[in-house]
């Protein structure tokens, strides 16, 4: 069971307690800090849509510390990020692996960040296949389709050729923060919040 901290704020009409994620949402900050599952994706999407309705032009910040997760869940978040009309700042803290790396790269170009000791990783999709021989054939074909689809998305986000993405993703392909800049996964390494404020102050 995950413990969620609560914070207490003085509202002028008394004190009000709220969970830390709700408090961060007030500052247009969304946290992806676990495996990317369907329930998590629905929560993140709801937060993003709420922030869009609050102010369709003001930047949103997404902090990512995730080992990856389900492809469909990750793509749902990715499509929502692209659906928003505002700039999205992404930050890797700790790790952004697999679908986490894709979401990191999906931020607005020029506003994709990593902290100095972050690690990023891309690889090809995988999954257990069970059922009849016909079922196995269909599922294997779907995995190959998703592999090409994800490679196309990463190519668009990073500027790397699709062929290179596919080749690099054959095995777990790890990158440090500076390597991720060279790869096109992020745009800059930040060491303090002051540096991140420069990205959002003009919007």
Swiss-Prot record:
Enzyme class name: hydrolase
Gene Ontology molecular function: ATP-dependent peptidase activity; ATPase binding; serine-type endopeptidase activity
GO cellular component assignments: cytoplasm; endopeptidase Clp complex
Active site residues according to the UniProt entry: 98 (nucleophile), 123
Gene3D superfamilies with a match to the protein in the record: 2-enoyl-CoA Hydratase, Chain A, domain 1 (3.90.226.10)
Entry keywords, A to Z: Cytoplasm, Hydrolase, Protease, Serine protease
Top-level taxon in the UniProt lineage: Bacteria
Catalytic activity, reaction form: Hydrolysis of proteins to small peptides in the presence of ATP and magnesium. alpha-casein is the usual test substrate. In the absence of ATP, only oligopeptides shorter than five residues are hydrolyzed (such as succinyl-Leu-Tyr-|-NHMec, and Leu-Tyr-Leu-|-Tyr-Trp, in which cleavage of the -Tyr-|-Leu- and -Tyr-|-Trp bonds also occurs)
InterPro entries linked: ClpP, ClpP/crotonase-like_dom_sf, ClpP/TepA, ClpP_His_AS, ClpP_Ser_AS
Localisation: Cytoplasm
EC number: 3.4.21.92
GO biological processes: protein quality control for misfolded or incompletely synthesized proteins
Family: Belongs to the peptidase S14 family.
Subunit-level organization: Fourteen ClpP subunits assemble into 2 heptameric rings which stack back to back to give a disk-like structure with a central cavity, resembling the structure of eukaryotic proteasomes.
Summary of the function given for this chain in its UniProt record: Cleaves peptides in various proteins in a process that requires ATP hydrolysis. Has a chymotrypsin-like activity. Plays a major role in the degradation of misfolded proteins.
Protein name as catalogued: ATP-dependent Clp protease proteolytic subunit 2
Gene that specifies this protein: clpP2
């Amino acid at each position: 069971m995950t413990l969620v901290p609560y914070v207490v704020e003085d509202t002028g009409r008394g004190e009000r307690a709220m969970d830390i994620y709700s408090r961060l949402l007030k500052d247009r900050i969304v946290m992806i800090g676990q495996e990317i599952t369907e329930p998590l994706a629905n929560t993140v999407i709801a937060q993003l849509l709420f922030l869009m309705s609050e102010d369709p032009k003001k930047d949103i910040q997404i902090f990512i510390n995730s080992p990856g997760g389900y492809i469909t869940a990750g793509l749902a978040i990715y499509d929502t990020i692209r659906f928003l009309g505002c700039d999205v700042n992404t930050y890797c803290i700790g790790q952004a692996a697999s679908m986490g790396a894709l979401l990191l790269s999906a931020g607005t170009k020029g506003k994709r960040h990593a902290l100095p000791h972050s690690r990023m990783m891309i690889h090809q999709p995988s999954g257990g296949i069970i059922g009849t021989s016909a079922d196995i054939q269909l599922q294997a074909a779907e995995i190959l389709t998703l592999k090409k689809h994800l490679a196309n998305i990463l190519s668009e986000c990073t500027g790397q050729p699709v062929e290179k993405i596919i080749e690099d993703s054959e095995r777990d392909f790890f990158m440090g923060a500076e390597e991720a800049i060279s790869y096109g996964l992020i745009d800059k390494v930040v060491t303090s919040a002051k540096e991140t404020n420069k990205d959002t102050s003009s919007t």
